[in-house]
Design a protein with these regions (language model features):
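RNA-binding accessory domains that recognize and position tRNA/RNA substrates
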Residues: 2-227, 231-239, 243-244, 258, ...
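Short solvent-exposed loop/turn micro-motifs enriched in small/polar/acidic residues
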Residues: 13-16, 302, 368-369, 378-379
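Short clusters of small/polar residues that mark proteolytic maturation junctions
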Residues: 34-35, 72, 300, 322, ...
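Proline-centered loop/turn at the N-terminus of a beta-strand
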Residues: 123, 206, 276-278, 294, ...
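Cysteine-nucleophile active-site neighborhood
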Residues: 243, 248, 252-334, 405-415, ...
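Catalytic beta-strand/loop cores that center a nucleophilic Ser/Cys/Thr
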Residues: 316-391, 437-441
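Short FAD-binding loop at a beta-strand-to-alpha-helix junction that anchors the flavin cofactor
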Residues: 392-398
Length: 441
């Protein structure tokens, strides 16, 4: 065998691996091999449809309490660049992949993905039929799962997973939030990707961020649109926040059941109408809960970078990055306001009706006046964004920071800046121009 052939064989071979087992709470079992830390991990099974960005997914605090399956077949090809991490450490419970790469090729890589998972204590499995797993979760809904490299008895693992905690009712935000207020260090705002982001503009707005599990890229984007950011814990009293004299308040993404995070949405309710607010993902849910909105658990959640969302104001379709398992029940915010809707007085069963009707519905909320539905998911008709008409506040369920994911919705950070500037038409933005001026392409 030639030296070149030996090198190629060494580069593509895998180390001797330990057996691993994945068991779902309905008894479905998948056998594979370990490709991360040793041990057992329990969590809710979900899947992510992103083709790349696994580092950002693994380090996203919103995945706390979950076992994540990547639908793309080969993961780890470009290793792990620590600068891409969204938090200091992964929050997910376990990782499932079809084929793990042990020999990454990328000039930015600091460490291979299997070595990173082992270092961070994340249990992972490879070699299973991830397509079958994803179809099963899609058809039967999200469910508890256990991933083990220690116990190879499926019946034993099934009993243990059925005795594990449910995600519903669990406050996971408190496990990923900061513990004390601190400024976001702009020195952390670095990016050495080959397609660099535009430089941040000078700070002209003071923004307080409720940390429900904030991704680093979100804080970076706030800096890029001119915000001096102070991050505070998830349960910080509204009076403390107002005492900081902010120009705006941002409520971040985060994991778990929004109904369990009462300490946050109670404070958000005290801030609405007193200072401009913007929320993303869990932050959107906190704003909706503060307005009396009800939440529902989705069958298998939205996790990935290919979700089409219609902006009802501009009639543009945005391809969005999403990561949530709960969603707003829009009719729970109030009764429909006429507003040129003709004889329509009852909420349609499917919010995509508003897309077909070319209308943007507005409800009358008992606490905060008129609220418009601004964005609708075209896949399943769920609510994806709202804007308050009588107070300065808006929110979206998806992730406009696009780490990982498409950049279609990056304009929303500019919209927040315009809202703090006092523009009534803050959402009226030339999206194409905004993308060219402030984002990679």
């Amino acid at each position: 065998m030639s030296d070149l052939a030996e090198c190629m064989l060494a580069a593509t071979s895998k180390p001797r691996q330990k057996a691993a087992l994945l068991v779902l709470e309905d008894g479905t079992t998948f056998q594979g091999t370990a490709c991360g830390a040793q041990g057992e991990a329990y969590g809710e099974m979900c899947f992510n449809t992103s083709l790349e960005g696994y580092v950002e997914v693994i380090t996203d605090p919103s995945y706390a309490g979950q076992v994540v399956a990547m639908t793309y077949p080969q993961i780890g090809n470009y290793g792990v660049c620590i600068e891409d991490a969204q938090a200091a450490h992964p929050a997910l419970r376990g990782l499932v992949v079809r084929d793990m790469c042990y020999t990454p090729s990328n000039w930015r890589s600091n460490i291979s993905l299997p070595d990173y998972l082992e270092r961070e204590g994340v249990v992972a499995i490879e070699g299973i039929d991830t397509r079958a797993l994803v179809r099963h979760v899609r058809d039967h809904g999200a469910m508890r799962a256990v991933l083990s490299t220690e116990d190879m008895d499926a019946e034993s693992l099934l009993a243990k997973v059925r005795d594990s905690e449910l995600l519903v009712g669990m406050n996971l935000v408190e496990t990923v939030s900061c513990t004390e207020a601190h400024p976001f260090d702009q020195a952390e705002n670095v990016d050495s990707r080959s397609f660099a982001l535009a430089p941040a503009v000078p700070a002209r707005h003071r923004v307080v961020v409720y940390d429900c599990g904030a991704k680093r890229s979100i804080l970076q984007e706030l800096v890029r649109v001119g915000c001096a950011v102070t991050v505070v814990p998830w349960n910080t009293p509204a009076s403390e926040v107002l005492g900081m004299d902010p120009d705006g308040v941002f409520v971040s993404n985060g994991p778990g059941d929004p109904d369990a995070v009462q300490a946050t949405y109670a404070q958000v309710g005290k801030l609405l109408g007193k200072v401009p607010l913007f929320g993303i993902c869990m932050g959107h849910q906190m704003i909706c809960k503060a307005a009396g909105g009800a939440m529902e658990k989705l069958k298998f959640g939205h996790h990935g970078g290919n979700h089409p969302v219609m902006n009802l104001q501009t009639r543009r379709v945005e391809i969005t990055a999403q990561n949530h398992g709960f969603n707003l029940v829009f009719p729970s915010l109030g009764q429909l306001v006429s507003n040129g809707l003709g004889d329509i007085s009852d909420h349609p069963d499917d919010l995509r009706w508003w897309v077909d009707a070319n209308r943007m519905p507005i409800v009358e909320n008992k606490r905060f006046g008129r609220i418009a539905l601004t964005h609708v998911n075209l896949n399943d008709g769920t609510a994806e964004g709202i804007a308050f008409a009588d107070i300065p506040a808006f929110s979206v369920q998806y992730h406009p920071e696009a780490c990982p994911g498409p950049t279609d919705s990056h304009y929303l950070f500019t919209a927040f800046s315009r809202l703090m500037d006092g523009h009534d038409d803050y959402l009226d933005i030339d999206i194409a121009k905004d993308r060219l001026e402030g984002w990679r392409f």
